[in-house]
Amino acid sequence: MPLGHIMRLDLEKIALEYIVPCLHEVGFCYLDNFLGEVVGDCVLERVKQLHCTGALRDGQLAGPRAGVSKRHLRGDQITWIGGNEEGCEAISFLLSLIDRLVLYCGSRLGKYYVKERSKAMVACYPGNGTGYVRHVDNPNGDGRCITCIYYLNKNWDAKLHGGILRIFPEGKSFIADVEPIFDRLLFFWSDRRNPHEVQPSYATRYAMTVWYFDAEERAEAKKKFRNLTRKTESALTED
């Protein structure tokens, strides 16, 4: 859906008439030309600076392999940005717009009640065939309900550069290939409804991801983590 230069007053209409219906019907959607060239360039330049100054580190695997870095499974380099850091004004503006879109979706997201989100994960696939194998963002109820990815790749040609995000919507007879083109914003459900992969990239590929949390599921996940931590500490003390 091409949007040109978004005005804040348009966000509620976009959320209610496009994002909500698409999420319920197919599980994902994307908006093109989200920020416009000028602001999008500001975000891109800041991300490039983070990359060039060595701020990015190898992405880690979650689940049973939590904390493990295996480059053949996940080849990106990442850092986390809150938006209040010096020089991150454009990123902060981007995050505020995404926040407003999700806020306007509100109760129409079904069972979810969104109160918070993660920091922004800035990611770079450095080329050389790096990608991310098929996975689910939230397979075990950690609270994440919506994944939002903003792409930053100018003149991207998927036939030459690869790097497609391929989504395998649960229960659907199709797959969805999303090219990571500059100024594109993607939304999809974070749970098992949307297994996905990043296909091998043969050029530097930048993206920024935020996850929105369902309040109840997130609280329960934190409670389970605290209980597990206490049990582990107790077992270590007994030993």
Swiss-Prot record:
Gene3D superfamilies: q2cbj1_9rhob like domain
Tissue localization of expression: Widely expressed at low levels. Expressed at higher levels in adult heart (cardiac myocytes, aortic endothelial cells and coronary artery smooth muscle), lung and placenta, and in fetal spleen, heart and skeletal muscle. Also expressed in pancreas. Localized to pancreatic acini and islet cells.
GO CC term (a single one): cytosol
Pfam families (alphabetical): 2OG-FeII_Oxy_3 (PF13640)
Principal location listed in the UniProt entry: nucleus
Location(s), subcellular: Nucleus; Cytoplasm
Single Gene Ontology MF annotation: 2-oxoglutarate-dependent dioxygenase activity
Post-translational note: Ubiquitinated by SIAH1 and/or SIAH2 in response to the unfolded protein response (UPR), leading to its degradation.
Induction annotation: Induced by hypoxia in a number of cells including neutrophils and certain cancer cell lines. Up-regulated 10-fold in pancreatic cancers.
UniProt entry keywords in alphabetical sequence: Apoptosis, Cytoplasm, Dioxygenase, DNA damage, Iron, Metal-binding, Nucleus, Oxidoreductase, Ubl conjugation, Vitamin C
One biological process term in Gene Ontology: regulation of neuron apoptotic process
Region of interest: Beta(2)beta(3) 'finger-like' loop: 62-73
Disulfide bridge positions per record: none
Database matches in InterPro entries: HIF_prolyl_hydroxylases, Oxoglu/Fe-dep_dioxygenase_dom, Pro_4_hyd_alph, Pro_4_hyd_alph_FE2OG_OXY
Residue positions binding 2-oxoglutarate: 205
Regulation: Activated in cardiovascular cells and Hela cells following exposure to hypoxia. Inhibited by polynitrogen compounds probably by chelation to Fe(2+) ions.
Residues covered by the Fe2OG dioxygenase domain: 116-214
Domain notes: The Beta(2)beta(3) 'finger-like' loop domain is important for substrate (HIFs' CODD/NODD) selectivity.
Function: Prolyl hydroxylase that mediates hydroxylation of proline residues in target proteins, such as PKM, TELO2, ATF4 and HIF1A. Target proteins are preferentially recognized via a LXXLAP motif. Cellular oxygen sensor that catalyzes, under normoxic conditions, the post-translational formation of 4-hydroxyproline in hypoxia-inducible factor (HIF) alpha proteins. Hydroxylates a specific proline found in each of the oxygen-dependent degradation (ODD) domains (N-terminal, NODD, and C-terminal, CODD) of HIF1A. Also hydroxylates HIF2A. Has a preference for the CODD site for both HIF1A and HIF2A.
Protein name, per record: Prolyl hydroxylase EGLN3
Organism of origin: Homo sapiens
Gene coding for it: EGLN3
